[in-house]
């Protein structure tokens, strides 16, 4: 017998290192006379798109194509004392540091152009790879070459530290996070009550990333985070032997999600027209870890499907990860409960009534649907 389950779960995720001293980042930026730009920052690119986002920040400041920008891997000989790329803060911290370095050089260029061509600083505008100086138009590299001849420094460091964060653990007071990221996921599952096997049929996700630096990257991060969270709560089970040795040491025994576990119908939308009210890099929000928690929707949907066997009176105690074996035993719990309720239900008691006599764990009250 097949049963469907549906669950809607939200997430509110604080963004910042809780060790406040880690909320800092540096950058080193060089602009060359051919108009190319070389950037070093303290973040580590792991495939999450960090370098692309930080390069976009610099490109936006100078109003040039991102192809001009080359980023070197993190190197403490260039940017020392780097914080970990963690806590979903990579783009926030390093993007801000890179932006400061770029703005420093840009301001030097504006001051030079105003002085050299005898115009006001407000008459110097960077647009679409060109620089307008009142009625004169120069390419970006032409301005750079002129500034070099004019002995203007074309290198700068940038530094950023997250403001407003403080926390007194003894008093349990303060502001541990700079801001929060929000999201919501709705999952629909199909459970085989004979075997405990299940399949995620569809997932709908709405996530808040502020003013997205790169929607394609952010949507990809939401998709990946959700699938990773789904694995955490459904299949990734750690098993130790009697001596405390870990037995699930590889993919043969520790099951991570595969492409076959991703629902054929996976819909991700980013919240539109909602800038981060805090002064983050172009008012964007972090997207690394928050979507991971949205995988909870799958676990709750599985419990909802199993709860239907007892008319949703109670929720089965299916621990995470909800492996097929645990789901099977959850099904057996609900079947037994349903039979017990049928035997003890007084005559005339409505179908919607909830018997409360003699019920003990592994049954839980409540519904996730």
Where on the chain are the PLM-derived regions?
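Intrinsic, low-complexity polybasic segments
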Residues: 341-345, 349, 357-358
């Amino acid at each position: 017998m097949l049963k469907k389950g549906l669950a809607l779960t939200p997430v509110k995720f604080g963004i910042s290192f809780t060790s406040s001293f880690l909320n800092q980042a540096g950058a080193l930026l060089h602009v060359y006379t051919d108009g190319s730009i070389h950037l070093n920052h303290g973040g580590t690119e792991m495939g999450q798109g960090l370098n692309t986002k930080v390069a976009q920040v610099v490109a936006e400041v100078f109003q040039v194509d991102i192809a001009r920008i080359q980023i070197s891997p993190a190197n403490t000989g260039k940017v020392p004392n780097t914080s970990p790329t963690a806590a979903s803060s990579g783009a926030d911290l390093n993007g801000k540091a890179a932006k400061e370095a770029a703005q420093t050089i840009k301001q030097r260029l504006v001051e030079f152009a105003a002085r050299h061509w005898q115009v006001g600083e407000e008459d110097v505008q960077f647009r679409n790879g060109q620089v307008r100086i009142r009625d004169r138009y120069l390419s970006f590299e032409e301005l750079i070459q002129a500034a070099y001849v004019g002995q203007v420094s074309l290198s700068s460091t940038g530094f950023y530290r997250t403001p407003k964060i403080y926390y007194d653990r003894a008093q349990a007071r303060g502001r541990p996070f700079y801001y929060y990221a929000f999201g919501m996921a709705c999952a629909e599952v199909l459970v085989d009550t004979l075997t405990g096997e299940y399949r995620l049929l569809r997932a709908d996700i709405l996530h808040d990333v502020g003013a997205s630096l790169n929607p394609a990257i952010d949507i990809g991060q939401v998709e990946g985070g959700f699938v990773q969270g789904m694995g955490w709560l459904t299949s990734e089970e750690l098993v130790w032997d009697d001596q405390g040795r870990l037995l699930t040491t590889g993919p043969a025994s520790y099951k991570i999600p595969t492409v076959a576990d991703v629902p054929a119908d996976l819909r991700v939308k980013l919240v539109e027209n909602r800038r981060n009210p805090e002064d983050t890099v172009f008012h964007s929000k972090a997207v690394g870890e928050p979507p991971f928690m949205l995988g909870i929707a799958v676990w709750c949907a599985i419990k909802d499907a199993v709860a239907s066997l007892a008319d949703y009176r109670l929720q089965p105690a299916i621990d995470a990860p909800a492996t097929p074996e645990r789901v099977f035993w959850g099904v057996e719990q609900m079947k037994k409960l349903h039979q017990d309720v049928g035997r003890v239900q007084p005559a005339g008691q409505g179908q919607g009534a909830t018997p409360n006599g003699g019920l003990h764990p592994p049954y839980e009250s409540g519904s996730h649907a």
